[in-house]
Regions:
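Alpha-helical transmembrane bundles and membrane-interface segments of multipass inner-membrane proteins
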Residues: 1-191
Length: 191
């Protein structure tokens, strides 16, 4: 297994660890909550960095593999979806935004399956990357700033996170629409 694929697998392993710390941050004292939110944020940030590094190293060193093409987006989806689920339970992300994110991911997966059947290669587009970066930055903002905020700042952090989540929802909807439009020929060719 090459280094980019090891980084992808590291991200897969970090997902349940992130989920544990995000879940236990709901219990205990304010200090306990802040500490576990910060740990969850650090884990998420490390996992996000591996997302950048695995793709960069794979392309730079000509180490792109079918395994990486499959596992990298799957690891990303697991990581960001888990974080948004916890943000919904913290009432800083609307379930509508989560539904938009999930719908887009299922739609894109469907398009990729159609593409695989026809032997079509679909390149990632800029809008998908913008969406991913915005989602990851929003999640990192919530976990880091939320953990470090004082009692008087909680309202601002919650409000800012809600606004950022709606921007994520809009970016997700836009990137999904563009992706589906760019690949509409696959639907026409489907039997």
């Amino acid at each position: 297994m090459n280094l980019p694929n090891k980084l992808t697998m590291m991200r897969v392993v970090l997902v349940p660890i992130f989920m544990i710390f995000a879940a236990v941050s709901h219990y205990g004292t304010a200090d306990f909550h802040a500490a576990y939110m910060l740990i969850a944020g650090v884990i998420f940030a490390i996992a996000s960095i591996t997302d950048f590094l695995d793709g960069y190293l794979a392309r730079k060193n000509h180490l792109v593999t079918d395994f990486g093409k499959f596992m990298d987006p799957l690891a990303d989806k697991c990581l960001t979806t888990a974080a948004f689920i916890y943000m919904v339970t913290d009432y800083v992300c609307s379930p509508i935004v989560l539904a938009v994110i999930l719908f887009r991911e299922f739609a894109v997966a469907g398009v990729r399956m159609l593409a695989a059947e026809t032997g079509t290669v679909i390149a990632a587009n800029m809008w998908g990357k913008v969406k991913t970066v915005l989602q990851m930055l929003t999640i990192i903002f919530y976990y880091f700033v939320g953990a470090l905020a004082g009692p008087t700042d909680v309202g601002f952090v919650s409000f800012a996170t809600v606004v950022l989540c709606w921007f994520c929802g809009a970016a997700t909807l836009l990137s999904g629409g563009i992706y589906l439009w760019q690949n509409r020929k696959l639907f026409m060719q489907a039997k």
